[in-house]
Each structure stands twice: as C-alpha cells, then as structure tokens.
Amino acid sequence: MIQSPTSFLIVLILLWCKLVLSCFIECLVALQQLIHVLLQIINSNLQSRLLLWHSLD
C-alpha cells in the first residue's frame, strides 16, 4: 500500500527532472544562438569601422 504512492512520487520527480533538464537545454541553445547573433553584429560593426578608418587615411 505504501510502495505504490512512493513509486508514483519517484516517477513524478523523475519526469519533473526531465522537464527541467529539457527546458535548461532549450535555454542553453537559445543563449548560444543569441551570443552568435551578437558576435556577428559586433563583427560587422568592427569591419565597417575599420573600412571607414582606412578610407579616412
């Protein structure tokens, strides 16, 4: 009688952990994409500044 709710609770905790882990992975992927986009913006900004700087010489 006691074992059934306990095993149910364990399954519930495992499912919750799986959900949290998948959300965490999704957040990491989104963060990685955001960093990639930001780096591209910074890179293009630096390139345009360098071109402008060389054209002024």
From Swiss-Prot:
One Pfam match: IBV_3A
GO BP of this protein: symbiont-mediated suppression of host innate immune response
Keywords: Host-virus interaction, Inhibition of host innate immune response by virus, Interferon antiviral system evasion, Signal, Viral immunoevasion
Keyword Protein transport: no
Signal peptide: 1-22
Role this protein plays: Involved in resistance to IFN.
Protein name, per record: Non-structural protein 3a
Species the sequence originates in: Avian infectious bronchitis virus (strain Portugal/322/82) (IBV)
